[in-house]
Amino acid sequence: MLKTILVAIFGSQNDRDIKAIQPVIEKINALEPYIKKLTDVELKEKTVEFRERLSKGETLDDVLPEAFACVREASVRTIGLRHFDVQLIGGYILHKGKIAEMKTGEGKTLVATLAAYLNALPQTGVHIVTVNDYLAKRDKEWMGVVYEKLGLTVGNVGNETKNEERRMAYNCDITYITNNEIGFDYLRDNMVIAKDDRVLRPLNYAIIDEVDSILIDEARTPLIISGACAESTDKYYISDRIVPRLKGRIITENEEIKAKYADVDLAKGYDYLIDEKNHSAVLTEQGVQKAEKMLGVKNIYDDLQSEWVHHLTQAIKAHNLYRRDIEYVVKDGKVIIVDEFTGRLMPGRRWSDGLHQSIEVKENLKIADENQTLATITFQNFFRMYKKIAGMTGTATTESEEFWEIYKLGVIEVPTNNPMIRKDYHDVIYRTEREKDNAVVNEIESLWKKGQPVLVGTRSIEKSEKISTMLRIKGIPHQVLNAKYHELEAQIIAGAGTKSAVTIATNMAGRGTDILLGAGDAVQNEEVKKSGGLHIIGTERHESRRIDNQLRGRSGRQGDPGSSKFFLSMEDELMRLFGSDKMSVIMQKLGLKENEDIQHLWISKAVENAQKKVEGMNFDIRKRLIDFDNVMNKQREAVYKLRNEILEGQDITDTIKDMISESIEEKITAWAVGKYTEEWDWASIDVWLLRTFGIKYETGNKDEISNLSRESARSAISGKVFEAYEHRKEQLTPELMLNMQRIVLLQMIDSSWRDHLYELDQLRHDIGFRAYAQKDPKVEYQKESFALFESMMNRVRDNTIEYIFKVQIDAKLQKMAIQTTNSDFRKNDGKKINKGSNKIGRNDQCPCGSGKKFKKCCGA
């Protein structure tokens, strides 16, 4: 109550933020008459002037008013669009590294030109990131002429863009790109052997279109570059045959709570339990015993048989949680994932941890190879590497807490240019899905007859096809949009506002394309407005309020009339899993007849509360994901930093010598144990020296060293080894030796990092079981992943040393080394890597990701 009174008196924080920007907008508007008088040449020369001012110490904020005024004028002269004041506000918010929430149709694409131009002036690159290739290409072609009018270069990177073209596009002042393409380019850049194969510049500033979709919806799925992993597929087939013979039970949250208070064992009489809400499966004690008997093993949880638990659990999930034509489709003999947020097919994407293979077996398809991760990163950690990011979307307020907590991005809601007059009706709820579907079709028929356009949003391809079939039976013409082709998708969605148009779309198919009433025809536009504008029908509530708001937002753009209504049933997934028991009881007590519905604010509120509950759960999942990925991120940064130093052509001789000294120290410490030298393990030292460095001691030499102290012995061995190193250098020539070292070290880093990622995958899969031992899985993961990382770095060191002394330089390697010498080393004047040792100093930050010093964390 107090908060409401304070807002009424002082305005909301958002109102105050907008008010604070107004003086800047007034400055921009005051400059408009002056900028209008400039010739095209003078307008273009403004860019040169701004860059000179920046070089003399002015800031981007200093040149912002004039720069924005120039962009506005360039837009008028090229594409005939003048930025409204609210769009200038949006551009200012983007420049300040925040999220501008702008309703559908408010011109977000045009808004981006303001901040993009300003931040491109320092010539460090601006990326405008969007969700698909079609939008990236369309926006580059549409807005590119504005930038070119001002003397900037513009590029676009798509799925088919070749390497050299990518490099050129990224070297442009402004680059239009999808989130997937730039993420994969970053990973690929950190896998190359030659510096010239990299395509990206350092990450400077990104404007993320549909920022909620990229930073939240897709945050649970990491980008992964993978390769085939040789593994037997027998266990998938055996597990698939066992699961149908097991008895399972799907449990709801309410059942779980009631069972807990009543002390009832839900697992009794069942072999496995399915938690549909959390998308998880677990074998019961009875199920474990039955599975062990069928498999003929004593204990499926011991080290040798533990993979059986994993394979059986994945098979259970494949049979119970993943449904054909909802979570995936089968096309051309392949299982193709359906994006749960957009309904789009995602060819080439695969579920990990063997789940995809389990589904392939379930569908009697040829099983594909298990994938091994070669490089991976989450969008959370990727976009946090930019110096500055900003975002645009029509729906960000509901996720403002997450944007701030994960990305430190504030959200400011930009006022609409014209008042919003769309009417949003209360939800209507039916007992069964059948009754709800009938009501949806009847509503469509009624609106179609009066000429009002209708956009029907569904959550799955299956649901789209079901509604489509019912409309065909009634003879109602319509378009079905299952989001398979982005360009076709845009064309269909653009026509969804024409008279009597009926369009069925999965979730946010066609997002990014405006729906114009009458499709731009003035006469038809008036007719459609008189009929009530575009009517939105939601056939089910999504887990996230934001997705529902996105659907609603397709109607009522730029002050147009419109309306929206959601149709629900007690059989909908959200209601079934998260709806309260009270709602079910009320529905029963009301004694509703066939096809009767309830409409009430209380019901809409109950649904919203259920959605808030799911949003909270999903937020926790994403936070857990980033907690674990932060551990890997510190290690990834360390490895990629070393890789880049090597690629930059810096002299790594000191690094190699440090590795050799470290290795000698480690071996002497391990084998020179005992008070007397006679007690030392000379046999192991001999074998190691011969195997690694090709050094063979004669008996006399050994006797001589045996009489020395440990320090003297270490010094003597080091002398022999470095003598052999210098001899190796003379054999090859210093230039060839230098570049052979670089090539070998890169290959050792890559192969060891690949193995390390596999080990981390396994660790992460198993770490959850530590909770049963009253241990925090996150803390355990930090400690063990650090131990694995240190072990990996030791492997890199030992393998690199051995290869340097043993590798045979064939013609191909020699040519490669010489080319590297000419192109890299001489260009960089033989700079040395500032690196003393592979070991972590006690006062260094711990690579586990805790943020603590090593001595206070894993090194304690």
Swiss-Prot record:
Protein's cellular compartments: Cell membrane; Cytoplasm
Transmembrane region(s): none
Free-text comment on the cofactor: May bind 1 zinc ion per subunit.
Paired cysteines (S-S): none
EC number: 7.4.2.8
InterPro entries xref list: Helicase_ATP-bd, Helicase_C-like, P-loop_NTPase, SEC_C_motif, SecA, SecA_CS, SecA_DEAD, SecA_motor_DEAD
Substrates-to-products reaction catalysed: ATP + H2O + cellular proteinSide 1 = ADP + phosphate + cellular proteinSide 2
A GO cellular component annotation in the UniProt record: cell envelope Sec protein transport complex
Residues annotated as signal peptide: none
Residues where ATP binds: 87, 105-109, 514
Main subcellular location of this protein, as a coarse class: membrane
Keywords carried by this UniProt record: ATP-binding, Cell membrane, Cytoplasm, Membrane, Metal-binding, Nucleotide-binding, Protein transport, Translocase, Translocation, Transport, Zinc
Binding site for Zn(2+): 846, 848, 857-858
GO terms, biological process: intracellular protein transmembrane transport; protein import; protein targeting; protein transport by the Sec complex
Subunit structure: Monomer and homodimer. Part of the essential Sec protein translocation apparatus which comprises SecA, SecYEG and auxiliary proteins SecDF. Other proteins may also be involved.
Purpose of the protein: Part of the Sec protein translocase complex. Interacts with the SecYEG preprotein conducting channel. Has a central role in coupling the hydrolysis of ATP to the transfer of proteins into and across the cell membrane, serving as an ATP-driven molecular motor driving the stepwise translocation of polypeptide chains across the membrane.
Protein name, as recorded: Protein translocase subunit SecA
Organism: Endomicrobium trichonymphae
Underlying gene: secA
